[in-house]
Every structure is written in structure tokens, then in C-alpha cells.
Amino acid sequence: MATVAYKCPNCASPLTYDGTTGKMLCAACDSQFDQDTIEALNAQEEAGTVDFVAPTEEYSASDAAHMQAYHCKSCGAELITEGTTTATECPYCGSPTILPDRIDGGIRPEMVVPFVITKEQAQQAFEGYFKGKKLLPNIFKKDNQIAEMRKLFVPYWLFDCNAEGDIIYNAEKKHTRREGEWEVTTVEHYIVRRAGSMSFENIPVDGSVKMDDKITESLEPYDLTKAVPFQPTVLSGVMADHADVDADDCEKRAVERVESSMINSLRNTVHGYDSVSVRSKNISASGGKVTPVLLPVWLITTRKDDKVYTFAINGQTGKLTCDVPTDKGKAFLWGAGAFAGIFGLAALVLYLLKMLASGTMLMAGIVSLFAALIVVFTLIGQLKQAASKTSAAGYSTEGCQLHVQYDRFLYANTTRRKIESQNKEAAA
């Protein structure tokens, strides 16, 4: 039988169990720890795995009788629509080489979110996008014509699961005081533990290899309470993509967002420290369920200098995202201008208050720099560029339920620094 050796989080010396107190003791530094904290510290970091229950219902013979499949020879898209709808071009690449095919298997969607945004509204959203964007490249300043506009149902997998998180942090509190000609700094070291659980419903991951995850995640959220049961008639006049990325492959992305949400939620419960770092973590998920759905998207492309740019619009809410780049030259000029203006105003105020010391000017410069960066990032945000989501917090049903909240002081160390006299500073 293997022997497990536990080490002190403070000094790394061996720990022994004290039957009287029920705690783990360190003979080297006299620290005491609860058993569950030491067990958590020694737990391996491991990514949570979920056994999601994937759907198995395929299109029925009745569905197939009322539906038409198409195959794009250009990009390989596998598409379906209602039987009376005739497709003349691929909604992804615009190719006219789209051939009729037969419905041959495929997971049947359980729900469909209908289109609310009309073609005219989507076109207005595209045209309005270019107004007031300070960091748009000059090529978008005029003649923004729609090259192609397509109405498409995109296949998604919706993931439900429960998550458990247990994280140990190293935390510090820093205190500085003056004792005569000495500056004394004391750093207190703590071990902090947080454990909790979260439940998630309907985390969407698109099941189309042809749709960039950054675009589909930027279109969130959809109001799934407005979804209707799938029937072939729902596809009348609209193409729908076959899910060519299965639920097992999409599971990883859902779990990544769940883990990130769990980590962020537990970290947000740690307060009152000057610095906090993760010492160890254990995140797991369970009870997974998967639901296949179709969600509405308008795809619009425009061509500039022989390059195609894509705009995607949430067909339910009208939310827009795109792959338009930032004009870096304009971003620099706006940042420099904002810095100069803010710093100049701060310098004027300090001059009027007769506070033009080197320390105050340095602080004014730092504040001006941060303010200028805020201006630039605000302007970049106006471009609505597609970006991946980093969490699934919006799909949590109750937020984080905290089960363990543990803060224990470990030790403190003190440093002393001699302060140069004001006379010496003035002479220098």
C-alpha cells in the first residue's frame, strides 16, 4: 500500500496528524491545518469531464417526405429546407453549383428559434453599422454595398450540466508604516480556500464547421423561450445547415466555458487581499444533457479591395458582429490625442494649484495614459468585432452556491528600508 506524504503549505516540511486536535501539524513552523484543506491542496488539477447524454432521434420518413436536401459542390455544405423551397445558391459561399440531394440520416433538431428580424431590418443594421465608427479603415467610409445576403438556420447544440469547483489560493496583505527614519513593510501570508457549485442550462455551441465560433458566440444570447418544436414547415423559404460537428466534439467548448465561469465566480468571493494567486484547483462537471436546435442568422458579405468581409446578424434580436479590422494608425492617433489633451489639462490644473512636483506630474502622466487607453478600447468596442466568449455565466441558473469559505493566516515577514532625509533629496 502506497504511503502518502503531506507537506506544510508554509515551509514544505512534513505534516503529521494530531489525534487530540484532529488537525495536521507542522513541527518545523508550528502551523496547524484542517485535514480537508490539506487534502484539497494535494488534489491534482484536472479538467472536468462530463458524460453528456447526446440525442439520438434522426429525421423520420415523414420529415424526409416534406423536406429537400442540397449539397454544395463548392464548399461542401450539407443543407436542408422545406420541400417546396427551391435553393439556387449556397448560403455560405454563394456558389450556384448547389445540387438537390436526399435526406439521409442526421440528428433531428428538437427546437427552432424563428426569424424575427426581416431582410429590410438586417439591411438597415448593415448600413447603419458604418456610421460614427472612428477607427474604421478608410475603405469602409463609402460605397459599402451588399455583395450577398443570406438567411440561414445554423445548427447548435445546447448543453446543460452541473459544475463543482474547489480552489486553493495564496493570498497576501501588505502593510507599510514609518518608524523614524525607517519604512517598515509587513507582508501577511494566507491560505484561502473556496468551494462551490453552479448549474448551467442551454450553453450554445454551433455545430457547423463552416461557421466561425467567434461569430456565433458574439451573436449570443438567443431567447430560447420563444423556440418552437421542429417541423419541416418551419424551414419554408429558409435554408438550414446540417450539423457536421457532432455533440461530442462540441462538448469541449461548452466545458471550457463552464470551467471559466466556475473559476471566476469563486475568485469573486475572495476579498480583502492585496494579491491573490491560485495554488491548486479542481473543477469538475456532471449530469450533462444535450439538445439540438436551429438558430436564425443573417449572413451579409461586402467586398473591399478584392477581400470579402462578413457581417452576421442574430435573426431574433438583431445583434450584429463582423470581421472588420481596426485601423491601427487611427487608433494610435486617437490614443495620442487623448493622452495629450488629458495630460495637458492635468498639467494646467497642477500649475494653477502650484503642485508641479515631479511626483504629481508622473502620477498625472500615468492617469492620462490609462484614460487614453480607455478611449481607444471604447472606440474599438464600437466596431463590434467577433470574439470568443470566455465564460458561460449568462447561462447559470442560480449563480455560484458557496459550500466552503476558508481563510487562514500562515505567517508574516517584515522588511525595513531606510528613508533618505528630505534635505538629501533636495540636495540631489
Predicted regions and their residues:
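Residues immediately within or flanking Cys/His clusters that coordinate Zn2+
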Residues: T3-A5, T21-K23, A65-A69, A87
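Short cysteine-rich clusters marking metal-coordination/redox-active sites
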Residues: C8-C11, C26-C29, C72-C75, C90-C93
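Short functional micro-motifs and their immediate structural scaffolds
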Residues: S13-T16, D34, I80, I98
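Canonical alpha-helical transmembrane segments of integral membrane proteins
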Residues: G335-Y351
